[in-house]
Amino acid sequence: NVNCSEADEWRDQINGVIRVTMGGGLCSASIVNNTAYDRTPYVLFADHCLSGSPSEYVFHFNYQSPTCSGTAGPLNQSISGSILLANENIETGADVALLELTSDIPDSYDPFYVGWSRSSSPPQEAIGIHHPGGATKRISFTNDNVSSGGTGGNYWEFQYIDGRVIPGSSGS
């Protein structure tokens, strides 16, 4: 649960992960920054989660338990509608989609625009913030053995030491 003390170090990043409802399914996604830092509402998502029309997707912000032991969260902070800007499927080497929301994210949602890097060096650790099975937001931790994987080294491989991912976690 993201409101347990183990997640304190990642409070900002927790606000950068959202739940997406689309075509009867659920996935996770990240609000991603751009180099202009202008709060353009870009959302990074998994290509295999694309289903139906992105204009009908619903993006839920802050769907998380208010306490460490809770399992319920509010669904009253949401935006409907997006445009697909770019995507690449897993057969061609990636599983990524970039969406732009059709509405700005209200400041009252306290969004955090996560950063990105073009570095080819693996990070020292990886943290997964996601909505497993569409549930309230959870956090998973890795060990320090992050390595480059896949043909051409186009993704990071790691083993979680606490937490796990299941359907619905994809896209975060």
Located regions from the model:
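Serine endopeptidase catalytic core focused on the charge-relay Asp
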Residues: N1-Q159
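Short pre-catalytic strand/loop immediately N-terminal to key active-site residues, enriched for Gly-Thr
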Residues: Y160-I166
